[in-house]
A protein has these predicted regions:
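Conserved acidic
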Residues: 1, 29, 45, 130
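A short hydrophobic beta-strand->loop->alpha-helix junction that borders the nucleotide-binding pocket
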Residues: 1-2, 98
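A metal-dependent, Asp-based hydrolase signature
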Residues: 3-41, 59
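Conserved donor sugar-nucleotide recognition element shared by glycan-biosynthetic enzymes
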Residues: 9, 49, 107
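Alpha-helical structural context
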Residues: 16-20, 44, 85, 117
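Asp-based, Mg2+/Mn2+-dependent phosphohydrolase catalytic module
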Residues: 27-28, 54-58, 74-182
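Short, acidic loop-to-helix structural element flanking the phosphoryl-transfer center
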Residues: 39-69
Length: 182
């Protein structure tokens, strides 16, 4: 499952349908399954902030940089949780969600859309990703990509996906941020 993190919901559902049923999911099936998944997601208690994430975002903003969210999700509840956990940190009009793109990660379109929304060139941005598909998408978009291994995968998987740098945790990235940005 972690290898598919970052895909749009529709893409993930189609992969499962093809693997398990040998067919494409209909639009109605996708909507029904995504709806059920959203209900399940919202039934879970709210996750705590990842250690180092808030401090890193504060450093980013203090340097005059604009943090942006690029997610394969389209769940309003996820975006609301981001605002709750990181108040005032992200501008909704600069977020890229599943509804903004035709192709999800690992396609570069989500990050290319972020560049467009932010009025940036690839060499003016940095991607921070925790999943192989997101790392691959950032790399394919030509953006310097930092991988943070927050999951069960071997770090080499993230490097093989195209990460320029790899950190074992968000806290480790935060602690090294000033050195990286020199």
């Amino acid at each position: 499952a972690y290898m598919h993190e970052g895909r749009t919901g529709a893409s993930t559902i189609n992969i499962v349908f093809q693997r398990e049923l040998g067919k494409e999911a209909t639009q109605e099936e996708i909507e029904s399954i995504y709806h059920e998944k959203s209900i399940l997601f919202n039934s879970y208690p709210e996750a705590e902030r990842m250690p180092g994430a808030w401090e890193l975002l504060q450093k980013v903003k203090s340097e005059g940089l604009t943090p942006m969210v690029v997610t394969g999700s389209g769940q309003l509840s996820l975006l609301e949780r981001l605002e709750h956990n990181f108040p005032g940190m992200f501008q909704k009009e600069l977020m890229v969600t599943a509804f903004d793109v035709k192709y999800g990660k690992p396609h570069p379109e989500p990050y290319l859309m972020a560049l467009k929304k932010g009025g940036l060139k690839a060499d003016e941005a940095v991607v921070i990703e925790n999943a192989p598909l997101g790392v691959e998408a950032g790399h394919k978009a030509g953006i310097f990509t930092i991988a943070v291994n927050t999951g069960p995968l071997d770090g080499q998987v993230l490097l093989d996906a195209g990460a320029d740098l790899l950190f074992p945790s968000m806290q480790a990235l935060c602690d090294s941020w000033d050195t990286i940005m020199l």
